[in-house]
């Protein structure tokens, strides 16, 4: 056996069927699509259901986007433990330390985790539980 005599295994190299290339191929003229009609022609658009009212039009429209919605940057209590006792925590300090990326419409402090430090926290909003936890730890809150 020589290198030029090597053959691929039988059935391992099947040629793809090229349609529309002459009648003797068995898939010429209509290219295996039959006669006329929608299926013999181009594609139907995405979401087309054969003339039936499509799903995206059967389902009612709902809700709206509130243009005056304010989105707050969230700070959890557990993140405030990184500061030393007696620190005055301001939005600028939070951004500087990488706790929040940007201020958005303001900063809101939420009561996720425990606070073990006595801090003066200045933010735009506080949840009730967060405010209580800061004051219980001996700190103070100030709404900006």
Curated annotation (Swiss-Prot):
This is Large ribosomal subunit protein uL15. InterPro entries: Ribosomal_uL15, Ribosomal_uL15/eL18, Ribosomal_uL15/eL18_sf, Ribosomal_uL15_bac-type, Ribosomal_uL15_CS. Residues 23-35 have a biased composition (Gly residues). Signal peptide: none annotated. SUPFAM superfamilies: Ribosomal proteins L15p and L18e. Coiled coil: none annotated. GO terms for cellular component: cytosolic large ribosomal subunit. Binds to the 23S rRNA. It comes from Leuconostoc citreum (strain KM20). One of its GO terms (biological process) is translation. Residues 1-44 are annotated as: Disordered. Part of the 50S ribosomal subunit. Disulfide bonds: none annotated. One of its GO terms (molecular function) is structural constituent of ribosome. Keywords: Ribonucleoprotein, Ribosomal protein, RNA-binding, rRNA-binding. Transmembrane segments: none annotated. The gene is rplO. Belongs to the universal ribosomal protein uL15 family.
